[in-house]
């Protein structure tokens, strides 16, 4: 009898404590996180400049291409200025040729070269690789971009920038023809279109991270197409 009473008391106490442990006093109002979630790392294929350099050792010189905006240059200041001037609060300025004319004519003198681009270009030039810049910008009569890039990155054998915006093409992505034309082996870029253009051209696409304060929104998903992503490449 005494044992039965003891078991009953234990059962009652256990039942009384369970709701207090399991139930929330109020439903959450924000997404939040927890200790386990904070420790979860996404399965991204990270790569460094040093790893690339070692991997390419002993290989013949090759042709390399780079996107420009948010890949080699932090050009958000130009785009912010353009938006305020041509279409405040809207993205219409990107379809305005006057904006592209202004950017290509010399606005990039206010863009900031990214350190990751300096490191990559130095590494490739030391190997004897040829550097090409392929952009989705629309061209105009005056090209003020090529000299800015040549000076910023000390390009030894500078090729004119390839402006792919508005060009006729048979490919899905506008940078694909430039990648194919120049027989590129590796294409670097920050956008989904860069990675997809590289895939379409059948070459290796490597993602650079976009700066957190970039005006180019929304942010792309790093490694979203299984591509390699350069560490510390947002600056």
Swiss-Prot record:
Source domain of life: Bacteria
InterPro entries xrefs: Acid_phosphat_B-like, HAD-like_sf, HAD-SF_ppase_IIIB_AphA, HAD_sf
Q: Where is Mg(2+) annotated to bind?
A: 67, 69, 190
What is the enzyme's class at the highest EC level? hydrolase
Which residues does the entry assign to the active site, renumbered to this chain? 67 (nucleophile), 69 (proton donor)
Localisation per UniProt entry: Periplasm
Q: Name one GO cellular component term.
A: outer membrane-bounded periplasmic space
Say if the entry is tagged with keyword Cell wall biogenesis/degradation. no
Which cofactor does the UniProt annotation name?
Mg(2+)
Pfam families recorded for this chain? Acid_phosphat_B
Q: Does the keyword Coiled coil apply?
A: no
Which function does this protein serve? Answer: Dephosphorylates several organic phosphate monoesters. Also has a phosphotransferase activity catalyzing the transfer of low-energy phosphate groups from organic phosphate monoesters to free hydroxyl groups of various organic compounds.
The protein depicted here goes by the name: Class B acid phosphatase
Record organism: Aggregatibacter actinomycetemcomitans serotype C (strain D11S-1) (Actinobacillus actinomycetemcomitans)
Report which gene this protein is encoded by: aphA
